[in-house]
Amino acid sequence: MPKIGIIGGSGVYGVFEPKEVVKVHTPYGRPSAPIEIGEIEGVEVAFIPRHGKYHEFPPHQVPYRANIWALHELGVERVIAINAVGSLKEEYKPGDIVIIDQFIDFTKKREYTFYNGPKVAHVSMADPFCPELRKIFIETAKELNLPVHERGTYVCIEGPRFSTRAESRMFRQFADVIGMTLVPEVNLARELGMCYVNISTVTDYDVWAEKPVDAQEVLRVMKENEEKVQKLLKRAIPKIPEERKCGCADVLKTMFV
């Protein structure tokens, strides 16, 4: 079974042809969609469309626990997450790729843990993302001459609404990009000892910029971003070593009370 899982959108189908569809039942309900298993450049991977096959789940209703649990049940050890984000800084331009290294959680009412009792866990999130995977994707993006930022802080909001101008100006003080789907996905993966890397693609500037949003321009950028991510996945995934040496699973030794 696959050891690499991808959570993202329809753009993944550009490099991935499903060979098998697996329905996984979890203690947390059904995942966003049945898991599709196929290959990217000869490497077996599992794929879940985060928002559902027909984009039926808004960000605050994505079954995050079921998605991560289902991948783990299939034997997935590494998760590659793809997100579209808005920019909070001038230098993070539409069309750029950001390999996120930190996040700030401004969500409000999601299911954040697998451990609601009687077993209690306090997982370390000081460095939430797998250093081994981050290095591979950063180096590969540079090889492909893609516009990549090696670091970025992602502020995750509840959604589905966008920010007010006041909120956007506040978020600018401590984050680089803004989105709605990183949390609780990243902490759930950590609770199961899985490696997790986030590839965020910038679609436009958030409302702090006070620039009129051109819907056609946003769609054009999103299409280009899909193509960039496809190139990145095709080149990077074959570089991922069979055995993990990153220590992401070590958190399981210290997180239980």
UniProtKB/Swiss-Prot annotation:
User: What class does this enzyme belong to in the EC scheme?
Assistant: transferase
Residues binding substrate, per UniProt: 180, 204-206
Please provide the Gene Ontology terms (biological process) for this protein. Answer: L-methionine salvage from methylthioadenosine; purine ribonucleoside salvage
Pathway in which the depicted protein is active: Amino-acid biosynthesis; L-methionine biosynthesis via salvage pathway; S-methyl-5-thio-alpha-D-ribose 1-phosphate from S-methyl-5'-thioadenosine (phosphorylase route): step 1/1
Which Gene Ontology cellular-component terms appear in the entry?
cytosol
Q: Which residues form a coiled coil?
A: none
According to the UniProt entry, what is the EC number of this protein? 2.4.2.28
Q: Which UniProt keywords apply?
A: Glycosyltransferase, Purine salvage, Transferase
Query: Sorted alphabetically, which InterPro entries does this protein's record hold?
Result: MTAP, Nucleoside_phosphorylase_d, Nucleoside_phosphorylase_sf, Purine_phosphorylase-2_CS
Q: Does the keyword rRNA-binding apply?
A: no
Q: Which positions does UniProt annotate for phosphate binding? A: 10, 50-51, 181
Keyword Transferase attached: yes
One Pfam family per UniProt? PNP_UDP_1
- Give the highest taxon in the source lineage: Archaea
Q: Name one GO molecular function term.
A: S-methyl-5-thioadenosine phosphorylase activity
Site positions for Important for substrate specificity, renumbered to this chain?
163, 215
Q: Which PROSITE patterns match?
A: PNP_MTAP_2 (PS01240)
**Per the similarity annotation, which family is this?**
Belongs to the PNP/MTAP phosphorylase family. MTAP subfamily.
PANTHER family cross-referenced by the UniProt entry: S-METHYL-5'-THIOADENOSINE PHOSPHORYLASE
**Could you give the subunit structure recorded for this chain?**
Homohexamer. Dimer of a homotrimer.
Q: What is this protein called?
A: S-methyl-5'-thioadenosine phosphorylase
Naturally occurring in which organism (per UniProt): Pyrococcus horikoshii (strain ATCC 700860 / DSM 12428 / JCM 9974 / NBRC 100139 / OT-3)
The organism that produces this protein has a lineage beginning with:
Archaea, Methanobacteriati, Methanobacteriota, Thermococci, Thermococcales
